[in-house]
Every structure is written in structure tokens, then in C-alpha cells.
Amino acid sequence: MLFRSSTSAWPNIGISTVLILVMLVIAVIGIRITARTQVAMAVFEYIVLIGVSIWGLVYVLGHHAGTFPITRGWFSLSGIDGKGSLSAGLLIAVFMYSGWDATIYVNEEVKHRRVNPGRAAVFAVAILVVLYILPQMGLQGVTSPAKLQANASSALIYVTQVLGGGGWAKVMAVALVLSVIASTGTGIVASARIAYGMASHRVLPPVLGQISRRFNTPAIGSIIIGLILIAATWAYLLSASIGNVFSDVVDVTGLLFALFYILTACAAIVYYRRRIFSRVWDAVLVGVLPLASVVFLAWVVVKSLQGAPNAQRYAVIGIVAAGLVLMFVARFVLRSQFFHLPRESAPKSVVE
């Protein structure tokens, strides 16, 4: 491990709070320094992860003692055990993708904003395929499934230690820490921009839509999001059953993002409705694919809710209900102009 473990949660709380504050300051200062920081951390993470994965793949293919060879069963859906395992895995995939589409939320702050954010979100899917499949192939066979299960909370660090010893394990630990820090920064930036967009239409309090004259960022919204994140981190680390809490958070967040992407796909179909019948490629791109994603994600949500514990169901229902209440408040109490805007549609031309 990179740091010595402690029986007290307070050292972890202190370190986590400091890291969140650092990423919050970077997010407030500006999008350029945020992007450069994210790129620097990402490059280190990917070099380590891909390098160790290739190392593990060569190690497994070399048939070293204790390794488990790659088989076709690794890539077969028939190898998924247990009722609901497929939908649970897909839900985790949705959770893992959330945050990789952050470029969409900063579309007003990037060059060529009509095309670059969307392309980056699609490009992220290709990156994810490499980042998740390659480690699965390269690291799963390094040691026995029983040992991987016994070290499930730090599997990447354990496998790296098997391959190269404690020194390389610490390098992997640093990469994982940077991954968490980068995700924290992404969450602050994306959430603050979402809040800014909603506040600018008076769906949320106007204070969240204020832009700092000095930094040209939604500073107040970023600070509020950062404080909420700190409070959530404290609650999580002080929980008596951290493992269960983490599992519940992943599942509930995955369900909420699945619902979010369903609504996004529906909005895309409505916005591009004039292009659906213009030509075959447009029909596939802005009609068939979004509709297929709606059906697919709806199936994932239904299957996941059927097998979810009551606590997770109530959490999802409660959050959605709270969102509906806030929507009605914005519509009928705050008189948000958003609900009075004309329905927009893209020009009837070739999709860029």
C-alpha cells in the first residue's frame, strides 16, 4: 500500500478534504488549468495502467507458475453467473462512463464548440474500451481467482505487486489515487456547469448561475458543489459499513445516470426530428441509435430495480420524486423562462 492503514477514519477524512479543496481551487481558477491538470494526471494513469496490463498479458502468455490462461469463456455472456448479473454489470458500466462526457458540459469554453465536445464524448467510449478490456485480459490471469477475490479492494495493486514487487505496486497506487483525484475534479467542473445552465434559466437559484469576473468560471456554484462533496465524503468515511455504502452509491448513481441518458437520448430525437427522414445515415445516427439506447437503458433500469434492495429502490424513487417537485416549483413558483421557450429543432441538413 502507498500509505499505512489507520484504524481511525479521521486521517482519511483530512487527506480527502485537502484533496477536494485543491481540486476545487483549480476548478474555480479556470478551465485551462483544470484541463491541463486533468491531462497530466490522465497521461500518468494510462501509461501505468496500460503498461502493467501489457506486462501482465506477456506474463500470462508466458505460462508462468500460478497463472491462469486466457480462454474463450472470458468473452462469453454464458459465463455470467447469477440472476441479474448481466444487468448489474451493465449498470456498473453506465456508472463508469458517467463523467467521461464532461466535455459536453464545458461546450461553451472550448474551441469549435459545435463539434469538439460531442466528438470527445464519443472518443471517450473508444478509450474506455481499451482501458477496461486490456487490464481485464492482462491482469485477471496473473494469479488465481481466489487470491483476486481476497484482495478485491486493491486488486490492481496486488496484481502489480505479484508482477514486479512492492515498488511497482506503489506506482500503481499513485495512479489509482490520481484517478480518484481526477474524478473529483471532473465531478466539480461538470456539476457546476450543469447547475449554471439550470440557474441561468431560473430552474435553480440564480446564485448558482453567477460567473466570476476574475476567473470567468461559475465560482460560487463550484464552491457549493465542492462543499457538498466534502460533506458526502465525511458521511461516507464515517459510515460503519463503508463497503455496503459504496456498493449502494454505485448502484443508485448508475441508475440515475441511466435515467439521465434515457432523457438525453429522447431529447436528441426530438431536437433532430427534422433530420430523421432526410437520408438513411441521418435516420440511423439521430433516430435509430438514440431510440435503441433508450430501449436498452430502460431494460437495464427495470432489471436492476427488480433485483435491487429496497433501500436502493427507495433512494432512486426519492431522488426522482425530489427532482419532479423541484421542476414543478421552477415551473409554477419561480416562473422559469425555460418552460416557456419554443421547442427547438436542428436545421434539416447533413449531420456534422
Enumerate the language-model features and the residues they cover.
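TM-loop-TM module centered on a large, flexible mid-protein loop between adjacent transmembrane helices
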Residues: 1-4, 122-188, 204-253
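Helix-loop-helix junctions that connect adjacent transmembrane segments
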Residues: 4-11, 40-173
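C-terminal membrane-solvent junction of multi-pass transporters and transport-like membrane proteins
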Residues: 8-11, 37, 208-216, 258-309
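Membrane-interface loop-to-helix entry segments
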Residues: 11-68, 98, 121-125, 256-259, ...
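Hydrophobic membrane-spanning alpha-helices of multi-pass integral membrane proteins
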Residues: 223-233, 287-304, 320-323
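Terminal cytosolic tails of multi-pass membrane transporters
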Residues: 265-289, 310-352
